[in-house]
Structures are given as C-alpha cells and as structure tokens.
C-alpha cells in the first residue's frame, strides 16, 4: 500500500489544486494531459475458456501465494485463465491505493475539463524505465535496480517464481507519446494505453541484463511476494497507434 497519504495528497490533492486554478483563474490552457497508470486495471484482462468470455480477476489471496501458487484464479473457472492484452475499455478495478488515486485523478481531469471547456487526454502508462529512475522504490524501476546490483557485483532477488510479467516501456517513447497527446487532433476525452504491447517476465529481465553487462551474478528466485502486487498485465496499444 506504500505511502498512502503521499499518494492521495499528490495524485488527488495536486490534481484538484490544478483544476481549481483552471476553473477559477484566467488562463490560456487548451488541453490537459493526465498521466494515469496501468495500475487502474488491477490484474488486467484474461480469457476464460470455461465461461467463454473475458474476466477480470481480483487480488490474489495471501493463503494461495503462501503455498507458492502465484497464478490468478477466477470463480467458476477450472481451466487456467489465458492472459490477453488489456484494452482501454477493460474493467477499471485497481487493487492498490496508488491505483485508486490514479483512477480518481483521471476522472477528475475529464469531468472538470469538460465542464470548463478545456480538452483532456489521459495516458495509461505501463512500467516506464530509463535514466534518472528511483532506486529506492521497489514498486518502480526494476530495470534500474537490477542494473545497479549487477554492475556492483551483487546478486538479484526475484520475487514469486520469476514468471510474473510486465509491459516495460522506455521513457523516451513515453515522452514522445505525451507530446503527441498535446498536439494530436480529435483525441479529447479519450484514454490511451502507452506501452509496448509485449509481456516480459521478470526472470527474463534479470538474465537479459546480466548478458547485456557481461557480468555473472547469482539470480535467486525466492518465492517472496507482496500482497497487492499484480501477477501479469500488458497493454493493447492499438488505439495509441492510430
């Protein structure tokens, strides 16, 4: 849950302050681009062969993960769920405080901007990586954290079974997309996933970085886990490509 008050004050309070200024003071702002997050999707979208439809699993329970069973489950389904790309019209069901604040942030921007005649666009960034990323926050910057440990000759601790996946997108691509969000026509009121559309597991990330740096450090798949972490999620980016 990690720094609850900070998430609420910055993401919701800061956005409310901005919208107050846009509503109550003279300005020349034409469009607001809000940085949402893939966290609003929670576990993301899956296909159920049992139900023959898309399903949206809830948070994985502690007792299940404690047994080393890390895959998501869904009531009434006996067959394994199949991970599919998460589209912008997928269910919004964040399973973290951070995700809830990003959901509210986006809703505030679209609601208020529409009422005051300002255009709005929201970008749902996937796992962004690149220079300048924090090394102290375990919920972001896994590539930076792993890279630093490898270059210092330290081993890497991979949580769960290492097969959890994320959609990793480079910061320059995110910056380019954000600029397009400011300039493109006909996008007001819409939300776009910003990612690569590729699911990469964490163990592959660790081994790829070792190979890139040419430094052999031990990679330990520990089975440790954090409640509230998602198992998988990757974006459908077809809307952003149009």
Task: Mark where each language-model region is.
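Glycine-rich, phosphate-binding/catalytic loops in enzymes
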Residues: 6, 48-53, 139-141, 175, ...
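Gly/Ser/Thr-rich beta-alpha loop segments that engage phosphate groups in nucleotides
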Residues: 16, 44, 101, 132-134, ...
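Short aromatic-enriched loop/helix-cap "lid" or pocket-rim segments at secondary-structure transitions
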Residues: 43-48, 133-137, 205-207, 231-233
């Amino acid at each position: 849950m990690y720094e609850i008050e900070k998430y609420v004050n910055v993401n919701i309070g800061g956005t409310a302050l901005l919208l107050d200024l846009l509503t109550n003071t003279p300005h020349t702002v034409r469009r607001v681009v809000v940085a949402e997050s893939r966290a609003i999707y929670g576990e993301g979208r899956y296909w159920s062969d049992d139900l023959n439809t898309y399903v949206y699993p809830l948070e994985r329970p502690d007792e299940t993960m404690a047994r080393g069973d890390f895959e998501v489950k869904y009531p009434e389904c006996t067959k394994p769920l199949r991970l599919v790309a998460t589209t912008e019209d997928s269910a919004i069901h964040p399973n973290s405080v951070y995700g809830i604040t990003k959901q509210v942030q986006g809703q505030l921007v679209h609601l208020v901007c529409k009422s005051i005649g300002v255009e709005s666009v929201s970008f749902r960034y996937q796992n962004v990586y690149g220079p300048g990323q924090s090394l102290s926050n375990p919920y972001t910057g896994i590539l930076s954290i792993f890279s630093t440990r490898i270059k210092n000759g330290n081993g890497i601790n991979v949580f769960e079974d290492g097969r959890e996946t994320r959609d990793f997108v480079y910061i320059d691509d995110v910056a380019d997309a954000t600029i397009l969000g400011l300039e493109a026509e006909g996008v007001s009121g819409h939300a776009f996933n910003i990612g690569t559309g590729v699911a990469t597991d964490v163990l592959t990330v660790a081994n790829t970085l070792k190979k890139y740096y040419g430094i052999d450090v031990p990679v330990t798949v520990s089975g440790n886990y954090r409640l509230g972490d998602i198992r998988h999620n990757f974006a459908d980016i077809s809307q952003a490509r149009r």
